[in-house]
Amino acid sequence: GLVISTGERPVSTISSEVHLSYRIRPLSHHFSFIHAVHRIHRNRPGKRVLTPASSNRVTLTLPSDAATTMLASGRRLAVRCRPSARLASSQPLAAPADPDGLSPPARRLVDLEDRHGAHNYAPLPVVLARGSGTRVWDVDGRSYYDFLSAYSAVNQGHCHPKIVGALAEQARTLTLTSRAFHNDCLGEFAEYCTDYFGYDRVLPMNTGVEGGETALKLARRWGYEVKGIEENKARVLFAQGNFWGRTLAAVSSSDDPEAYGGFGPYMPGFSSLPYADPAALRAELERDGAHICAFMVEPIQGEAGVVVPPDGYLAEVKALCEQHRVLLICDEVQTGLGRCGTRLCSDHDAVRPDVVVLGKALSGGVLPVAAVLADDEVMLTVRPGQHGSTYGGNPLACRVATAALEVLREEKLAENAQVRGRHLREGIEWLRPKGTSGNPRGARAGASAVGCDCDRGRRGGESGVGCVSHHVR
């Protein structure tokens, strides 16, 4: 049977047929629709019970709001239910005019963005207005479980009270000084961050892509000053399928035509190798290791579709880099900070990268904060005037980032991610029809990042689930 509770007000006071369209949201970004005809019957004051005109035994309890859980044919799905028409006869009224099913307030906001904003994104037709923990609400008050987590930027949950409290308290005191002066927050953040991750120094920036750029500048500088590479000859290796941003340096390292097409000329000194292929890395290091200063890699590739390398991959990469005196840069912007069941995803292979790039959840999603971690040999190659940011290391960001790291530690969110990750993969596997392909790929043994390969030959598979990630709270 199917039971949906939708609020307090009755759907209709008439007694006839009602045509309903159910918008079903599985664990993906894609929708399917079921249209059914039901007859209305009085049940008790304030409620109406609808039964189908067909022989299928389905019961709907429909007084008004919207979201709940649907149990049908043994499959649990998140669902939205809204009458597409209310009838005083057997003839349905006209369907809603909005092609995306948006309310007038939501449509107005979407149109404003479309009319005045750049068209560099194609969002889903949902206009969010509020968030708390694992849930978000749209402008019409409907709630959703957030399975995207702002690309892992809200690992601590939306609007975590401790992080928001730190933001509000510091915002009333001092927000920005620039690095022309010391401030009373940067030193404390630097101490906490370096102690937490076990590095000599941290260089704070604003966004993940700035962190990546910073790591590359450090690597090149180290290559010239420490390794002794001839000036302007330093090379950096990347993995194919990488994604770390959309600046010119980032797209220069990309092999995605959508990312780099039409933006040349590109940054020199960048080369890419197959991901999770130590043999390819070994061959390139043996061929030209004297000119290679760094290999930058994601422990698990996110944008490429949650691509998980074999166990031991990073350990083998680290050994090769040490053998050829090449820095290992781990891009932990998306995989770090508890998302994969450990502080850093590289911890799964017991690897300590030479340079670590952090971002996204470093602020719990309340403002942009990024950081680069390294030891003295690498970090101290950059001197005053050679790198910086007006907002990097500002008091507001430092207080927020410290609070965000404290939440990760105090609430044991990395450990919780292991438990939630197992639950998520088990649930997705339970939803998958028997005999079909599309097993969920878990990010390591326990993690809250999961990818699903969908069978394109089956109905709905052409859209499928690209990447499903679950909060660690």
Question: What feature does the model see in each segment?
Answer:
Residues 37, 53-94:
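N-terminal mitochondrial targeting presequence
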Residues 23, 39-42:
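Compositionally biased, intrinsically disordered low-complexity segments enriched in Pro/Arg/Gln/His
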Residues 88-473:
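Conserved N-terminal phosphate-binding loop of PLP-dependent enzymes in the Aspartate aminotransferase
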Residues 32-34:
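Intrinsically disordered, low-complexity terminal segments enriched in Ser/Thr
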Residues 1-2, 11-12, 40:
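Ser/Thr/Pro/Gly-rich low-complexity, intrinsically disordered segments
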Residues 5, 9-16, 21-23, 28, ...:
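Low-acidity, Ser/Thr- and Arg-rich intrinsically disordered low-complexity segments
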